[in-house]
Amino acid sequence: HASRATDGKKRRKRRKESYGIYIYKVLKQVHPDTGISSRAMSIMNSFVNDVFERIAGEASRLAQYNKKSTISSREVQTAVRLLLPGELAKHAVSEGTKAVTKYTTSK
């Protein structure tokens, strides 16, 4: 049985999903002339994944406590209020509300 490498068949590289393009777009909005190294991008990607998992976990717990089987924008908003400190939570909630409104009206 020949190994994959010597088989002549190209082994398709598994596409790794990341928030890279979105992080880059936000960077260009705030600092148009600033670049980002791949190491810094990797750190930012880990950060976004970490915050996403924390919010999702907290929202999941909130839904369970209230005997609900669905996470709604309300659970996510409460999770954000619990996880983020003061002013950061305020801004995150207003941006989230704005995004949900934009999504609802575009449907």
Curated annotation (Swiss-Prot):
Gene3D superfamilies: Histone, subunit A. InterPro entries: Histone-fold, Histone_H2A/H2B/H3, Histone_H2B, HISTONE_H2B_site. SMART domains: H2B. Keywords: Chromosome, DNA-binding, Glycoprotein, Isopeptide bond, Nucleosome core, Nucleus, Ubl conjugation. PROSITE patterns: HISTONE_H2B. The keyword Lipid metabolism does not apply. There is a cross-link at residue 102 (Glycyl lysine isopeptide (Lys-Gly) (interchain with G-Cter in ubiquitin)). Glycans are attached at residue 94. Its main location: nucleus. GO terms for cellular component: nucleosome; nucleus. GO terms for molecular function: DNA binding; protein heterodimerization activity; structural constituent of chromatin. Monoubiquitination gives a specific tag for epigenetic transcriptional activation and is also prerequisite for histone H3 'Lys-4' and 'Lys-79' methylation. GlcNAcylation at Ser-94 promotes monoubiquitination of Lys-102. It fluctuates in response to extracellular glucose, and associates with transcribed genes. It is found in: Nucleus; Chromosome. It holds the Pfam family Histone. Core component of nucleosome. Nucleosomes wrap and compact DNA into chromatin, limiting DNA accessibility to the cellular machineries which require DNA as a template. Histones thereby play a central role in transcription regulation, DNA repair, DNA replication and chromosomal stability. DNA accessibility is regulated via a complex set of post-translational modifications of histones, also called histone code, and nucleosome remodeling. The nucleosome is a histone octamer containing two molecules each of H2A, H2B, H3 and H4 assembled in one H3-H4 heterotetramer and two H2A-H2B heterodimers. The octamer wraps approximately 147 bp of DNA. Belongs to the histone H2B family. This is Late histone H2B.L4. The lineage of its organism: Eukaryota, Metazoa, Echinodermata, Eleutherozoa, Echinozoa.
